[in-house]
Amino acid sequence: MKQRFRSLGCLARLSEYSESSLILRFFTRDLGAVSVLAKGIRRAQTRNQLMALGEYELNLYPPTESGLYLLGEISSVKERDLSASPQHWAAADCALELLSSLIIPTEESPVYYTLLDSYLDFLQTRKGSAILLWWRFLLRVFNFFGTPFDLLACSLCQATDESIAAWDRGTGALFCHNCLATSEY
């Protein structure tokens, strides 16, 4: 067998693969989004301990022709139970699903992992509207991608001293009074 690889990861999804195995989807600190084949885990007691959104230390074997990493060992680092609030659970799941779906270069995945980890920890401590925290997370992801979304600046002139007067539903652009008066909108 090849050399083991060790990383931290947040569990995004569990899927049954066979009578005794699972396919686990993680967002890891060092590799980004990975799918892991966990052979025999459904027979072991570990399956009851696996919880979505939890942080785990993983020992993985590199993928072979199947493209799935093979799970060597797994241990829980941090449990996150957001099941008491469906809004908080949905906001956490959306963030993890977003990062798992994006194509993130391997060298940048530690930055995104740190953002996700701090977001999930912060979400646990807050009461109230989770959608506001989700938007804050999304804006930070946009900034990391180099496309900041400034809610106080006009999309045409980039002025922040004028108040925003209109929003274009088609493009999402924000316009100040001056640009709205001179534009085709």
Model-derived features: where do they sit?
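Non-catalytic alpha-helical scaffolds and adjoining flexible linkers that form interface surfaces
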Residues: 1-23, 27-185
